[in-house]
Amino acid sequence: MKVLLLEDVKNLGKAGEVCEVKDGYGNNFLIANQKAKLATNEVINKYKAEVKKKAEKEALEKAQKLQMVETLQTITLTIHKKVGANGSLFGAITKEEITERLKEQHASLNLDKKDIELKHPIKSTGIYEIEVKLGFGVVGTFKIDVVAE
């Protein structure tokens, strides 16, 4: 019996491979546990189409992320905060505040706070470079200018 593996199976093969197995193993374990499907031409073609569609979708998402990084690199986000006598801020600037200000000043950029990498909260005025990880190995930076109110 030939089956198309839907996921990696130890000692048999990887997802997407067509394997020859005994009828009992194929029906009672692989197909019953949805680890494989009976390998007909229709099933194989459908699986290949799904894989191709998924790859195209990922390529499109990666291109959008790369375009977002290019836009981010041109941005300097200005944040006005109250400052004490020694130049330190009252409170700190966190990921949440950065994403809120980005949405206010640049509505086209849709970043989530989990995308922003802050090693520590910003507690004083100055210009800071913020790293953004958008997935698919896409990493970018933008600048934040913290000024006294």
UniProtKB/Swiss-Prot annotation:
Family annotation (InterPro entries): Ribosomal_bL9 (IPR000244), Ribosomal_bL9/RNase_H1_N (IPR009027), Ribosomal_bL9_bac/chp (IPR020594), Ribosomal_bL9_C (IPR020069), Ribosomal_bL9_C_sf (IPR036791), Ribosomal_bL9_N (IPR020070), Ribosomal_bL9_N_sf (IPR036935)
GO molecular function: rRNA binding; structural constituent of ribosome
GO cellular component, one term: ribonucleoprotein complex
Keyword set includes Ribosomal protein: yes
Alphabetically ordered keywords of this record: Ribonucleoprotein, Ribosomal protein, RNA-binding, rRNA-binding
Gene3D superfamilies reported in the protein's UniProt record: Ribosomal protein L9, C-terminal domain, Ribosomal protein L9, N-terminal domain
Alphabetical list of PROSITE patterns matching this protein: RIBOSOMAL_L9
Biological-process GO terms, alphabetical: translation
Family: Belongs to the bacterial ribosomal protein bL9 family.
Alphabetized NCBIfam families for the sequence: L9 (TIGR00158)
The protein's role, per its UniProt record: Binds to the 23S rRNA.
The name this protein goes by in its record: Large ribosomal subunit protein bL9
